[in-house]
Amino acid sequence: MTNVTPMMQQYLKIKSQYQDCLLFFRLGDFYEMFFEDAKEASRVLEITLTKRDAKKENPIPMCGVPYHSAESYIETLINEGYKVAICEQMEDPKTTKGMVKREVIRVVTPGTIMNQGGMDEKQNNYILSFIKDGATIAVSYCDVSTGELKVTKFNDESMLLNEITTINPNEIVAADQVSESLKQQMSLATETITVVDEISNEAYEVNQVEDTLMHQAVQLLLDYIHHTQKRNMNHIEDAQVYEAIDYMKMDYYAKRNLELTESIRLKSKKGTLLWLMDETKTPMGARRLKQWIDRPLIYKQAINERLDAVSQLIDRFIERDTLRNYLNQVYDIERLVGRVSYGNVNARDLIQLKHSIAEIPNIKALLDDFDDALPEQFRQLEPLNDLLDLLEKSLVEEPPISVKDGGLFKQGFNQQLDEYLEASVNGKQWLAQLQAKERERTGIKSLKISFNKVFGYFIEITRANLKGFEPADFGYNRKQTLSNAERFITDELKEKEDIILGAEDKAVELEYQLFAQLREEVKAYTERLQKQAKLISEIDCLQSFAEIAQKYNYVRPEFSDDKTLDLVDSRHPVVERVMDYNDYVPNDCRLDDDQFIYLITGPNMSGKSTYMRQVAIISIMAQMGAYVPCGSAVLPIFDQIFTRIGAADDLVSGKSTFMVEMLEAQKALTYATEDSLIIFDEIGRGTSTFDGLALAQAMIEYVAETSHAKTLFSTHYHELTTLDQSLECLKNVHVAANEYQGELIFLHKVKDGAVDDSYGIQVAKLADLPDRVIERAQVILDAFEEKDKPQPQISHLQQTESFVREPEIEDIQDKKEPETEQFQQGAFDLFETPPVESEIEAELKKINISNMTPLQALNKLSELQNQLK
C-alpha cells in the first residue's frame, strides 16, 4: 500500500502480529478499527462504518468506540466468538514529539475474560488445551477468572469429546492442526479453536505434574494465557491432576437427553436438574454444584461423607437457616481474588471481599458446633482477621467505582493524604466564604463561584445583572462570555485555586498509589482466600442438598453391595416440580443380578420416557451425595450411564435420525459393563418394522449375554414381550392406561406384565387429528390386525450356538415372507389414489431413507411436492 501515513504504518505492523483478532487501536478518546476489522465490528456492534481519508482514491473503512465504554463492546464481540487485541497509547500525546508509542497490552478471548460483566456468575469460563502423543491424549483446563487449573490424560480418543463436552470450554487451544471431523464434534462446546505452532520454552511452575504429556498440556495452556494477558497471573493455582475414570461417565448425549444442566427445547437452565437443585446462596456454590452434577462420584466412602453432612444439615433446620443467611452475605471470593491478581480490581470489589471474609468466623463457629458427621476439611475454615482489619481501617464503605478520582480512603489511614484533603476542604470552605463576601460587595445575590476542568475556578454573573456593573471596579478580569452570563476571575481567586487544586491533585495521585499498595497487600492472601472460597462453595452445595431434600420430601439413598437397584415410590424430581406435586404418580423399579432388564411397553404419552429418565437421574443425584425423590432407595454405584432417547438428526455431521440412534446404541453396547445403566427408548423406530424389530431383539440379547448392564428398554414392538420366555434376566412391565367410552386415560403407573396395544389411534385423537383421518386409520388398523403379526425369532441364548455366529445366506433367504409383502401392498391399495400420486408412491419406494442425510431428505421431499403441484 503506497502513501501510507506513519500512524497507519504503525497500525499495520501491529495488526500483522494479531491477524486472528479484531484490533482496538487507541487514538485519543477512541479505540479505532480499520479495514476488514472495521467492517466486521460495525456489523456485529451495529455502529456506523465510516472512512478515513474519504477524499482520497482508496479511503480506508473505519469505525470506533469510546474508550471509557469499550468493555461493553468488547463483551459483545467476545460473545460472538471474536478475539479482541487492545492496543494502548504507551505515551502521553501531549508531551510526546512525533509518533506516540503504542502496543497491545492484552488480548481478550472467549476463554480469558476477566471483566465480571462478560461472565455468568453461576458458570465457569473455561479455556482448555489438549495435546496428543500417539493414542495418548492429555487435557488441561483453566478458569482464568477463578484460578482453577486441572489436568488429566487417557488412551481413548472417544474420551476427548466426553471431557470437552463435560468441561464445556469457551475456547480450545490445540498443539496440532485439528481435523474437520474433530472440529465438528468440538463445536458442541465452542467454535473458538486456536492452534499454537510451538510451546514456549519459558518455564512455568508446573513441577507438581510429573507426567511429561500432562506437563506439556499445562505448559501449552499457561503459555497461551500469558501470551494473551501479558501479565503475571499469580492467582492461577497449582495444576490438580485428576482421573476421568474416578467419576461416573456420561457422554454429551446422555447429559443432553437427561437434561441435567440445559433443557433440550429451550436451551436454558430452567427445567433441568441443575435448576431444581440450585438452592445455593453464593456464585461459587452455584458453579460447584454444576461441577458435581457433571461428575458424580463412584467411591462409596466419598459419597457417604457428603450424605452424612446433608443428614446433619437436614436435622438442624435452625442452624441451616442461619448458615444460609451467612452465605447470602458472601460475594464471589474466587473471582474477586482473580481480579486482585489481574490488577483490574476496584475499591468496591475490595469492600465486597471485606464483607465476605467477615462472615467466615460466623460460618466456622456454626459448623464447629456440629458433630463429626461434617467432613473434616470444613474444620479448615480460617478467619482472616488481619486482612479484615486492613480493609476495615483503609477504605470508606461506599467508594467510587474509579480508583483514579480519589475518595477511596478513610481519614486517619495516611497522614500525608489527610493533610492534602484538609487543605482541599479548607480551600473549599474559603471559596464558600468568598462567594458570600462577593455577593455582599457587588449586591448581586445570584453571583456564584463555580469550577470546570478547562477554566478552573471562576465567578459567574448572569447577563441580567451586568447592567451598570463595572467589573474593573471590583478587580474582576473577564474570562469567558456566554449567551446568558459572563465569567470572571480575580487575582485572589487564582492564587487560592493553585493551592486547592494542587492539594486535590496530590491527594488523588497519592490515593491511587495507596490503592496499588493495598492491592499488593491483598494479593499476598491469594492462596488462603482461594482455599476458603473452595470450602465455602462445598458447604453451599451441601446446604442446598439439604434444603431441597426437606422441601421436596426426599430420602437418603443406600448403596447395595450386591448391585441391586430397588426404588420404591420413585419420582422424576423435575417433572413433579413443574406439575402439581400431589398429581405425580410414583413408581417402583427393582433390578438385580438375576433380573437386570426391564422391557417397558405402553402407549405414547403414558410416561415410559419419564420413568426411565427418573431412574437415571435418581442414580446421578445419589452419587452426587444428595437425597433422592423416593419412598426408599437402594442403588448400586454405576460407573457409566448410557442413553438413547428421542429422535433427532445430527445436522452438524449430516447423520440421519437412524444413524444417530445406531451410533448411540453402539457406544452403550461396546462400553457398558455390569456396573453400567443403559436406557434405550424405542430403539429401531427409525427404520422399517422388521429391521427395527430385529435390531431391538439383537440388542437385548447382546446385553443379556455380554455386559449384564442394568437396562431399561422401552418399545412399541410388542412382539418382543415374548422374550421373557427365553431370557430369565428380562422382565416385562408396562405403563398402564385405560380406555373409557372411547377416551384414553393415562394412569402413569408401571405394572408387571406386557400390553399388546400402543393405543396409537387414541393418542392421535388426543392430538385432534381430523376425524376423517382417525376413522380411516381405524379401518386400516383393523385390516392389519386380520393378518399375522411378525414374531421375534427364538432367542439365540436358548440355542447352543454363540451370539457372534453370522447367519448363512440360506438362512436369510429362508426368512423372506412374500405373503407379508403382498399383504402390505394390499393394505396400501385400500387408499383410492389418483394416478399422479401412484407415480410418487413408486418414487417413494425407491428411496433408502436409512442412507440419506437430513438435507438430502428435505431436498427429495421438496422435489416430490413440486411434482404434485
From Swiss-Prot:
It comes from the Bacteria. GO terms for biological process: mismatch repair. It comes from Staphylococcus carnosus (strain TM300). ATP binds at G602, P603, N604, M605, S606, G607, K608, S609. PROSITE patterns: DNA_MISMATCH_REPAIR_2. Keywords: ATP-binding, DNA damage, DNA repair, DNA-binding, Nucleotide-binding. PANTHER family: DNA MISMATCH REPAIR PROTEIN MSH1, MITOCHONDRIAL, DNA MISMATCH REPAIR PROTEIN MUTS FAMILY MEMBER. This is DNA mismatch repair protein MutS. This protein is involved in the repair of mismatches in DNA. It is possible that it carries out the mismatch recognition step. This protein has a weak ATPase activity. GO terms for molecular function: ATP binding; ATP-dependent DNA damage sensor activity; damaged DNA binding; mismatched DNA binding. One of its GO terms (cellular component) is cytosol. Belongs to the DNA mismatch repair MutS family. The gene is mutS.
